[in-house]
Amino acid sequence: YITSNDKSFLSIGSGIGGLELIINNKFENNTYYFIERNYVSKKVKYGWGGVVNDEAYNNLRLQKEFLNINGLRDDQINIFDFDSDKLPENKFDVIISLLSLGYHYDFSLYIEYLKKVSKTNTRIIFDTINSSYFTKIFKNVEIIKSDLNTVHKSKRIICSGFIN
């Protein structure tokens, strides 16, 4: 779902950035933008329907150190604190949010932002328990993984082409 033509990635709630390191090991010289929160919630919450949008499990300084130690250069890393920074307005090739957007954070809170930072062919990869809902939002919705026998009972989907 990711090719060598993809150069600009937005990760929402990626934690320390391990997936982005794996992507960079295969396709080097990409640019990564991370939208994160810079604190650890007192109580860890798991489950769908995080409408309040107040959870976080990250330390942005440690995230940057981890990415640097594991081979990402400073010019590849752009970390944005959701609570204090203006979010990036670049157009991205791929947007990834695994078990975050739609899991901890309500997808509807981000629709307008995602439209603003998406190209016509941007692929958005995230997890959901209601994949059919997204056929009303995107022209293309494909289930790429199902975890129906897990606690999360989720489907990972890849979407592109906003309808409106």
What are the functions of these language-model segments?
Residues 121-130:
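Conserved beta-strand signature within the Rossmann-like core of class I S-adenosyl-L-methionine
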Residues 6-15, 33-36:
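Conserved class I S-adenosyl-L-methionine
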Residues 108-120:
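A short glycine-rich, Lys/Arg-flanked "PGG" loop and its adjoining helix->strand segment in the class I
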